[in-house]
Every structure is written in structure tokens, then in C-alpha cells.
Amino acid sequence: MMRAETVLVIPFADGIGDFINAQPLIAALKRRFPEADFTVAASEHGNLLVNDPTVAVLKPSGFNYEPGRMAIALRPLLPQRLMAWFAGPTFDRELGPFDMVINLFYAWEKGMDFRTYWTPQVPPVPGAVHSLDFLADEIEKQLDITITHEQRKPRLIVRPSASLYASRFWLDNDLEEQKVVALVPSTNMAIKRWTLDAWLKLDAHLREMGHRTLLFCDRQSSSVQRAFEAAGSTAIPVYTSLDNVAAVMSRCDLAVGVDTGLLHMAGALDVPWVGLFGPTNPEVTGPYDQGKGISLVAPFEKQTTCGGCWKHFKYEDDSCRTLQDSSCMSHLAEAEVLAACVDVLKRERTTPPLYLPTYGYPEPVGAY
């Protein structure tokens, strides 16, 4: 039987949602190598999201690198698969050495059919496979193990200190006995954003229905927060460390968000959700358990110029080649999103958040 005392796991990407989705895979690997010490190559957010405090999260120095103009210009010429392969020996040398390196980044780039399935088509193209399923299947084949469907579902554990923060937040803002909706408009990719006007309308309609809204912000006094305030919204801004964000999110009755890390967080906390998609396919990169929410894909029939969208914004830049001043997200109607919110809010939440006693967690640093 294959043995290893030290294992490095390289997630398939370095976003918040990517780390959340990698956790069930890491758990499966730990079951296969129960005596091994595990390290994950990820940015600081990993320390605030990792469920297992025995797993070390280390940030490679390359993650601090901001590419210059020349690097950005050359990037389309460098095969992403090659860059993913080099991550293995590079991170092993910097962070290790390790007995075993499990490079999910390379497996993902090598095997996923991004050209066909990354950007959702209208009508949908059958045959899409979720990234988590693809990687779990690869691990099963390589290590001769079984990862059941239930074991593949991402779970996020709320830490005790964060739970206390959320309890105080609820009391301070008089949210007890209220229906609370989390709004997640922020993403670092402009092409995935829904229009600000649509967000303001959705917020107003939800509040008119008697719900309280929380505006999850990626920075203090963000432009979105200022726009909400200028519109007279009473949405409560949320900006805190990621473990606290998870605790606040876990108490919400619904999360509405674009394809970003906090949407995956909601799914991993069993918070009912409505996901807004345009250039990315919910069947490939959306929350894993689709039974917990509704994925809405912008009803924009893709043009020939959309054929390379997966490559343009995933590897090159952040612009739509088809719509000059926006993206297909602008075709997603607020009325459709509101109707989905009403539908999901009618459902009873079936699973409470997971909590663990305090032990061995790093101090909270950084924020969403």
C-alpha cells in the first residue's frame, strides 16, 4: 500500500470558494493517509476556513506576485496546463519537501473541458461535470478509494469565537425573529457582476416584503455600500474576518450572490441560496449541492465571440468580447431573481450550522 508521512495538496485554484470546495477532497485524502501530516498551498483565507486544525495552510511566495504588463501580455501564450504542472515541483521545493504532492490544479487544467462547459449555453449543453466531482473521480482512480456523494459535499464549520461574534451582531442589529437575507454583489471579476441598479431594486423589494437585508462587503466603505446608503437602503453592511463572515452567513435565511466565494460559503453552511450566473456555468463551478438553492443563468444566447470567454477572463483579462459596456449578467432580470428568492424563502431550512469546540485554531486575521 502506498504510504506517505508528509503530503502537500495544491487546490485547483486559490479563491475562497475553491478552498471550500477542496475541503471534502482533503478530508478524503486524510482518510487514505491517516498518519500523514497535511499541508495545503493557499492564501491566508485558508487559515480562517479550514475545518481541520491539524491541516497546515501555507502561502507560496508566488501568490504575492502582481504580474506586470509584460507578464499579462505573455500569459495567453503560456499553456495553463504547463503552469499548473510547474506548481507541483515549485511549491514542493519552497514549502517542503514532501513525500507526496497532490496537484489538483494540474488535474483540473489537464482534464476539464473548459471550452465546452465553462460558459453556460442557452439552451444548456448536456454533459457538464462539476469540478468537485471531476477531481473526486480522479482521486478515486489514482488512489483506489471511494468518495461517496455525501462525502463530496462541502461543509464549513463555524468556530466558537465567530459564533459569539454573530450572536452579538444579531442582538446589536435587532435581527432575532426576523427573516434575514444576505446580499453578495461583490466579486473581483467585473464580468461576473450583476448590475448595481438591479441589486438596489432587489434590496428594496425584499425589504418591502418585511425582510432584513445584510450587505456583505469586500472592503470597508466600498462603492457598493456607498451606493446602497445613497439610495436610502437600510441594508446592514458586513465587513469582518472570514470566520466571522461564515458565522453571520450561517444565521441567514437566504443568500443571494453572484458566482463568488461567499455563495459557496452559503452552500457549505446549508444556507438556502440563489446564485446568479452569466459567464460561468453553475453545473461546473456553482455550489455543489444544487438541491439547497436555485441557480439562475442569464438568458443570453451566446454569440460566436462568446466561444473563447472561458479563456479570455479565466487566463487573460476581465472583459466581455461580445457586449462592449457590460456582460451577459446584465440580461438577468431583477424580477426573475426576486421570484427565485421568494421561492427559496418558502422552503424550510433542513440542516443547522456545524459547530466545534475551540481547539488549535489560528487567530483571525484579514477580512473578506
Annotate each PLM feature:
Residues 1-368:
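Catalytic machinery of carbohydrate-active enzymes
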